């Protein structure tokens, strides 16, 4: 490394073979001893020390600032500037084309639409409005007819069953049977809707549980019980049923197996 300081030029720009040759020649020349010996200058027009050749090199002339890159010709610069806008337009068109979604097959479109129409669960203590703005899911009956889910909350389905039942009340299984009888959608729907019915029965202000034996009904087990609609439940259902729009009533009627009994069930 120290011997390279005594070269008259740099070798980094040379090929590997020429660099080795320059180092070989350098080994044959003994570098001067430091400090440099003073020699008498007969002309007396300069220093008495013979400096190294690198001391006479101006680094700004060898590697001027900003001149390490090859200058681009004017015609090359014009061609490059004309190419860049075309490249930008091509990138923009590619990005716009990537944003366009490919059409999905019909089966995947129906599946995606069904997932997007599932209503979110309500927070504890909150009641769902009677109106359902989402598109209703549908189910196919064994007869081949397509039944839509009624635009009603589970509270209203349970209240319909209890309002149109004997005063003694109904069991959970009887509530299931009433719902499947009047709304065929639940005949082929997944069994998870039954869990939702049992969950809504826990609303103490709308429903009450009474032992079956106290009402004189037939007991099927030691823990059998019946469910009844409380006064608060009657008041809430009547209030919300009166606020139904005509379009909602038509949708409910289309979801019923016997559309003619709708006025009697809702007491309209």
From Swiss-Prot:
Location (main, coarse)? nucleus
One Gene Ontology CC term in the entry: perinuclear region of cytoplasm
Region annotation (Disordered) ranges: 91-126
Q: In which tissues is it expressed?
A: Expressed in adult germ cells (at protein level). Expressed in heart, liver, lung and embryonic brain.
Q: Which Pfam families match?
A: Forkhead
Disrupted gene: phenotype observed: Reduced survival with the majority of mutants dying during embryonic development and only 23.5% of mutants living to postnatal day 21. Surviving newborns are smaller and lighter than their wild-type littermates. Newborn brains display decreased cortical thickness and enlarged ventricles.
GO MF annotations for this entry? DNA-binding transcription activator activity, RNA polymerase II-specific; DNA-binding transcription repressor activity, RNA polymerase II-specific; sequence-specific DNA binding
Question: What CDD domains has UniProt attached to this entry?
Answer: FH_FOXR
Compartments in which it is found: Nucleus; Cytoplasm; Cytoplasm, Perinuclear region
Stored Gene3D superfamilies? Winged helix-like DNA-binding domain superfamily/Winged helix DNA-binding domain
Q: Which domain of life is it from?
A: Eukaryota
Keyword annotations of the record: Activator, Cytoplasm, DNA-binding, Nucleus, Repressor, Transcription, Transcription regulation
Q: Name one GO biological process term.
A: regulation of transcription by RNA polymerase II
User: Which SUPFAM superfamilies did the record assign?
Assistant: Winged helix' DNA-binding domain
Report the InterPro entries cross-referenced here.
Fork_head_dom, FOX_transcription_regulators, WH-like_DNA-bd_sf, WH_DNA-bd_sf
User: Where along the sequence lies the DNA-binding region?
Assistant: 149-248
Function according to Swiss-Prot or TrEMBL? Transcription factor which acts as both an activator and a repressor. Activates transcription of a number of genes including the heat shock chaperones HSPA1A and HSPA6 and the antioxidant NADPH-dependent reductase DHRS2 which are involved in protection against oxidative stress. Required for normal brain development.
Q: What name is this protein filed under?
A: Forkhead box protein R1
> What organism is the protein native to?
Mus musculus
- Source organism phylogeny: Eukaryota, Metazoa, Chordata, Craniata, Vertebrata
Identify the gene encoding this protein.
Foxr1
């Amino acid at each position: 490394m120290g011997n390279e300081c005594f070269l008259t030029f740099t070798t980094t720009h040379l090929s590997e073979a020429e660099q080795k040759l320059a180092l070989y020649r350098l080994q044959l020349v003994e570098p001067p001893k430091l400090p440099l010996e003073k020699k008498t200058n007969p002309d007396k027009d300069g220093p008495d020390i013979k400096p190294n050749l690198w001391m006479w090199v101006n680094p700004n002339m060898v590697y001027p600032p900003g001149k390490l890159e090859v200058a681009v010709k004017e015609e090359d610069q014009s061609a490059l500037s004309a190419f860049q806008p075309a490249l930008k337009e091509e990138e923009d068109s590619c990005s716009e084309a990537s944003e366009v979604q490919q059409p999905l097959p019909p089966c995947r479109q129906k599946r995606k639409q069904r997932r997007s129409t599932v209503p979110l669960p309500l927070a504890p203590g909150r009641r769902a409005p009677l109106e359902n703005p989402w598109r209703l899911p549908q189910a196919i009956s064994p007869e081949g007819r397509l039944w839509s889910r009624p635009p009603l909350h589970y509270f209203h389905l349970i209240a319909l069953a209890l309002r149109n039942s004997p005063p003694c009340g109904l069991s959970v299984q009887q509530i299931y049977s009433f719902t499947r009888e009047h709304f065929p959608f639940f005949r082929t729907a997944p069994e998870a809707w039954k869990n939702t019915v049992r969950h809504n029965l826990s609303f103490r202000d709308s429903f009450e549980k009474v032992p079956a034996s106290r009402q004189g009904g037939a007991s099927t087990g030691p823990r059998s019980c019946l469910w009844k609609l409380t006064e608060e439940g009657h008041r809430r259902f009547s209030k919300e049923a009166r606020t139904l729009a005509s379009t909602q009533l038509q949708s409910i009627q289309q979801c019923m197996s016997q559309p003619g009994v709708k006025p009697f069930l809702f007491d309209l």
